[in-house]
Amino acid sequence: FLTMWDHCCGWEEEFRHFRPEPSAVRPWTGYVQPYTDTPLNRETVGQSVYLNMISKARKYIYITTPYLVIDVATNTALCNAAKAGVDVRIITPHIPDKRYVFEVTRAHYPPLLEAGVRIYEYTPGFIHAKNFVVDDRFATVGTVNLDYRSLFLHFECGVLLQNNSQVTVLRDDVRDTLLKCREVQVSDCHTGLLGTVLDSVLRLLSPLM
């Protein structure tokens, strides 16, 4: 937020006084690494964190995201993980906040489902969480949606956890959330020639989302 604020205002503010004093930092297990992502450079930090976590998975990948409007690299990484035997589960909303983005999200389901990725829609309402949990070892929570705007155009931030006690807390939260979801089947997606063409057109619109 401060990076965006300074950019819009033309300032160069000193951020160090916002950071806690060393004496205020409590002992903790594992690692907690905050990160930021900005469109002001060519480094897509948010996407790099996600792809790195996917590549390290050997047992499971749990993802919660309000939007699933992904690029080829992320789609390929998730499909390859599922094909390699990793339990890949993605939670998205069943009740959308934006109907057109919801349709584009669903257009991304078929290739993932066919590769073995399991997709769940949260039925009680809209879900806005953005997190990854991998193998009880890694987790990230932040503002980074799985869509083009968030990954490539917006100012975002998050925190990466490794071998930290909160990783399993997040895992348990995802598993509890899965109990409130309906699992999506291939038969729930657009079928036939018209449906396939419609999904292809919607995926072409992904960079605008």
Task: Report each predicted region and the residues it spans.
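Charged, low-complexity intrinsically disordered terminal segments
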Residues: 1-209
